[in-house]
Amino acid sequence: MRILELELQHFRNYSGQRVSFDPDCNVIFGENAQGKTNLLEAIVYLSCGKSPRARTDREMIAFDAPAAVLEAGISARDREFRTRVELYRDRRRKMWVNQVPAKNSAALSQVYHTVFFCPDDLYLIREGAAARRRFMDTALCQLRPRYAAALAEYHRLYDHKTRILRDSEERPDLLELLPDFNERMVRFGAVLVHYRRQFAEALNRYAARHHRECSGGRERLEITYQTVSSVTDPAAEGEVLTEQLRAHMESHQGAERASRMCLSGPHKDDLVITIDGREAKSYSSQGQTRTAALALKLAEREIYQNATGEYPVLLLDDVLSELDPRRQEFVLNRIAGGQVFITCCEDDRLPVLLGGKVFHVKQGAIG
């Protein structure tokens, strides 16, 4: 999977820019706040219809513009594709794949995949469960269209149920709607558990190897998927998962109505990460957490490659500058085989070390 060219109009600080990329290594350097991360953000957005940092599409439209356009030429699966997204301030976005209108972002995810790694990801191990769920969701939504659809529906049901519980004090009759919402949530929740368990097992397999190699064989990383307590075996058949999720939700009905909050379901899932048997979130050093985060991201890349037969586009946003020389070398020795984009600062030696095509970004212009 490779990005051949990218065109941006009124996206962030890019008023109008067209650029062609190297099929292997692209190094983007420049001072801070010039547009390096914005460029990577556009590549990620065109792969999945979601920004790794913006909460709304409007945030990505240039301040003085009514709309923004992102368009890319892509090579994947021995074919060439053209994807286009138009973002608007006052209406829904529009998307196309090869000039055919796309109903939703799932159409973008079927063209190419990205693995985005930024400095915040180095703290993935120590953050709360929401960060690790987001990590799973981002990967699985690109890989599995059924997962993306189930997640969107689960979130919709969760939001509705939350409003019902919140408003039930003034309108107790709303509680009559809960059984239907609960039943649909457990059915879509079972789909989430099924795919998350598969992803966590693959992640554990690959990340453990990367972590062992980076630590010189001194440490053992283990990743375990954690869902609601009533699910005794996340690998069970769908109907079994549904029944166990249903039992958990029924046992929490009283507490949910009392607290007016959704307390049961896979929206509380987590990845439990241990190093030598000790939970990394609480006991690992800064160096250990960074090594573990690197292992997770490299494992994510391998999962994509095994699922699709091609490496995803790898985007390293100012990550290498945050690492010591040993970890820098470890990453650079493991990114061959696919297209990579690496951002760095003006005074960084990475452009000289990496080769490939070098781009200088200044005030939203790429030279």
Give, region by region, the residue ranges found by the protein language model:
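Conserved NTPase motor "head" modules and their coupling/switch loops across ABC/AAA+ ATPases, GTPases
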Residues: 1-31, 172-313, 322-326, 330-333, ...
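Conserved lysine of the Walker
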Residues: 36
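Structural recognition of the conserved hydrophobic beta-strand(s) that form the central parallel beta-sheet
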Residues: 72, 339-346
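Long, charged N-terminal accessory/stalk domains
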Residues: 123-124, 130-179, 183-186
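Post-Walker A helix-loop "phosphate-sensing" segment adjacent to the P-loop in P-loop NTPases
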Residues: 45-57, 299-307
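Walker B catalytic acidic pair
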Residues: 317-319
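Nucleotide-state sensing region of NTPase/ATPase domains
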Residues: 48-125, 129-131, 137-143, 147, ...
